Amino acid sequence: FQAEDGIRDRSPSRGLGDVYKRQAQLAVQGKHSEALIQKLCDTPLGEIGYYHFRKAKIYNFECIIARTGYTGEDGFEIYIDSKYAESVYKSLIEEGKPFNLQPIGLGARDTLRMEMGYALYGNELNENCNPLEAGLGWVIKLQKNDFLGKAALKKQKDAGLSRRLVGIRLLDRGVPRPHYRVLNEGSLIGELTSGTFSPSLNAGIGLCYVSTEYTKLGTKLDVEIRKQKVPAEVVKLPFLPSRVKKTNC
């Protein structure tokens, strides 16, 4: 919405229309996602590179298929007119039975994105942080022409960051949650922006903004869970290896 306001301010003569209410998104993630969707679509999905998309048809329903996701797995996101979404969803569920396809909700997706260290708007991303602090400097091209926020980002990069987003793994039993306090030698140094139990790691994990002096891998911390200090340490992100197919075609 900030981008929308910026466009309206800088180019008031250009029209903007809301299309998201007319569009639905279906995300199919996992190692069999390409084979499954290919059964419903004539477009050669193997030719779609990571973070690329193509216009396509599924059962004669026009859609956009992107090789993107929020899980750390190879997968696709299908953008389609909302009135066709239910039919396509049911077809995916039926055709997905041989692949053991399972419908999942936001809870499962949130665990997967946390294991990848992916930032979530409202948690790791808001008006009080920036892409450099969040580890998203790879999406910022400061050598490009002027864009909203460029001057501020360049100034901060030149001066050096005062804090960074880090991954934290519990060393003892416990389930960390957002806003739990993070301590170093008894002193408060931050609070978790996200936290959960990782079934893959069999450990509690979380994300937190801390001063750069605490960002070194292996730094010992404590997470306060129900008034108890649970030992933790700063670990490398992502928590698990990514399995996205990053080869661009």
Where are the language model's segments positioned?
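Single conserved hydrophobic/aromatic residue that forms the stacking wall/gate
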Residues: 1-20
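Conserved, structured C-terminal
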Residues: 14, 18-249
